[in-house]
Amino acid sequence: MIAEDIKEQAGAGRRTSAWYVNALETALSNLQVEDSDTIDTGGITLGSLFFFDYKVKHPEKYPFWDIQPLAVALRFDGDGFLGCNLHYINPDYRDAVAESLLNSGGGSVVPKNSIHKYLFSGMGSLYKVPDDEDWASISLLPTERFVDKRGRAYPKNRAFNWRK
């Protein structure tokens, strides 16, 4: 499984978030399959988990955002899709939410602050996480990368807020 392989590669040493992002992208890139049915939806299929680069269109509107979302596509919405970004969920609960989303095909109740609209135009590299992978373990890899309006790192613990 991907997450276990990445943890093994990391070993006991401290690794940066960028290292984990690179390791996950490398592992997922080997598993990507072209699907001509998703050409008009930017490669997105509802109920699937995706890891991608994201550039916000109007950064002035948001106090912070995740530039490396790990999101389950819930609904198409015009020029993008609504997704549950697991990175906004406290890691203590994230794996349970990921497992619930996998088992329900994206039909689970999730924290409100984890729902975000992603524009197709803001998406960079896109990797689908296969359904037979352990979404819960992948969700716990430290790949979240929050930035503020000025492009500076935003504290992860402030982004993990169930109350919003």
Regions found by a protein language model. Name each.
Residues I2-F50, H58:
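Mixed-charge, Lys/Arg-rich low-complexity intrinsically disordered regions
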Residues Q9-G11, T45, F76-F81, N103-G105, ...:
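Intrinsically disordered, low-complexity segments enriched in small/polar residues
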Residues R15, T45, L49, G80-N85, ...:
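Compositionally biased, intrinsically disordered low-complexity regions
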Residues F50-F51, L70-V72, A136, F160-N161:
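Generic ordered-secondary-structure signal
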Residues K61-L101:
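Basic/aromatic-rich interaction segments and small domains that mediate binding to polyanionic partners
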Residues Y88-K164:
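Intrinsically disordered, low-complexity, charged/polar segments
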